[in-house]
Amino acid sequence: MKTKLLYGALLTALMSVSSLTACGSKSGADKYDKKGRLILELSNVYFGGSNEESIPAYDGADTYTELINERFGVSIKPTAPSYGSWDEDVSRTITGRSLKDVVHYNVKAYNFGTSYEQWVRRMDIKALPDDLSSWTNLQSMLNNISNLDALKINGKLYGIPIANDISNPGKDFSNMTYVYRRDWAKAIDELNASNPDYQPILKENDVYTWEEFERLLRAFKTYVDGTKENNDVVLIDQPWGFPSITNFYKSAPHCFAKDASGRAVNNFTTNEYIAGLEKAQSFVTAGLYPQEQFLYTEENDNAYKKYAAGLAGVFYDNFSFTNYGKLRRALKKNKDIDNVDDAVAFLKVKGSDGKFALEGTENWFSMTMFNYDISEKKMNKVLDIIDFLLSEEGTRLAVYGQEGYDYNVVDNKVVLTDTGWEKDPNDLSGKTYIYKSNGAKSLRYMATLGNDYKDYDPYTEADIEAYTAVTTWQNEMKAAKTAGNLRVVQEPADLSWMSTPTKNEATEKLLNKSKAYGTQYCYKQPLDTREKYMNAVNGVEEWATTLSEMNAKLGK
């Protein structure tokens, strides 16, 4: 949404009276602790820890934070918004003028105009220095951020996009895909082994053509109806991804696409998207998508719970390492499952064009932003810390801890110490380390999500099977892309990040309403004809105005 905000004389006037009108919350002298160290108030959603992974909230009281405090002459005071109300908490903080020195917000295309861009205009957040040459590691990371220019306003960048994986910046596809019950496929093949005319449904390396995928689903349906005793179903999607079948048809992932002339159009009314909806509708009619999918909600997490209980054959979700590991752990507790690898195998489906299809993604997620009123000294300290944590030395501190106590380097290899890394006595495999708070790792999340060190993080060892499965799938998709066998479904960047008055305000509404109408059309409740679906989607009044504004900007 590259936008030129032409403040002109008005901006000059505003800045001249910034003490009266600036929207940052904490103008005035910097504060210091009893040791004379500069106090930094930093907020990040990842500081909140994780109940699922038994990780407590980061409070800044650990040894490694103190090492950073001493190194940089600061006193770090971390806080975290609630993950469940992250956007609302940050927006309320900014509106209420209670912004910390550093804030973390889930900036994305659909909320760009009503958050980031608006906060720049109101002088709530501060631009990064034009010259980042003093922070070479940070500069190197930013050089690889996708669509970085879209985030610049008048040539300035107002925050740090948090990189997904600084070791793999070229990955432009999401982890939103299928897992399936390979053990069901094996069982079905075994049941039919005596039939000389039977063709096995299980495919090598879990790769299925479109026809083979449909045959697999129908075989699962027969299996569920005739063999299973529980309330089993065939194919389920996370509600935000329903119907996932459209991925193999649509040319854009969400609201906006381009027609042959380059005009912006409503993606939900294109022939490609409707063809995908109607294919999904046929899956509903055939019982491949269950009736209960219609009632699934993100709040209740129905789809995850269904698959985790062992009651579904195929599941579509965002399979990050964390999400995939969580699902594996849940299935391991199921006494009816003998082999968890077979219960949660990655299902690789090729569309009718012979290609895999995955939604595209930016190579970053959310942004670290600075209070407009933060002093230059404070801002530079935060940038110094981030740059250090992106260095080899800082990364080692984040991953292993303190050299000489937590680990030693022997023959150029890191060797963990027993004092620094205590094994969990309850894990008979000997792979699990007792969790310890490491502020360096937490603070590093202000710049990157830590996927660059997952393969050598000691904590990964306890979930090495999950990590191996996810990385193997990712590498296979990267190879498929290189070979021209992966279609990455991207929204054109000039549409995605474009800023117009109605688009800024209405995109989330357009997305939610259009997807809801798509679900109603798939289930014919109540939209039982294509005409009714089209009328419902086009009837959302903001569509016409939004597209008109966008095409005016495109000169179409």
Regions inferred by a protein language model and the residue ranges of each:
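Positively charged n-region of N-terminal signal peptides that target proteins for export
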Residues: 1-8
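C-terminal motif of bacterial Sec signal peptides marking the signal peptidase cleavage site
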Residues: 18-22
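Conserved N-terminal structural module of periplasmic/extracytoplasmic solute-binding proteins
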Residues: 23-180, 184-202, 247, 265-266, ...
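Short helices/loops that flank or line small-molecule/ion binding pockets
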Residues: 87-99, 113-117, 212-220, 300-315
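Short, solvent-exposed loop/beta-turn-alpha elements that line the ligand-binding surface or hinge
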Residues: 126-144, 187, 191-194, 254-272, ...
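Helix-loop-helix "hinge/cap" segment bordering the ligand-binding cleft or interdomain interface
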Residues: 154-242, 258-306, 315, 369-381, ...
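Extracytoplasmic/periplasmic substrate-binding proteins
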Residues: 239-260, 281-441
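Conserved small-residue motifs centered on glycine
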Residues: 388, 392-520
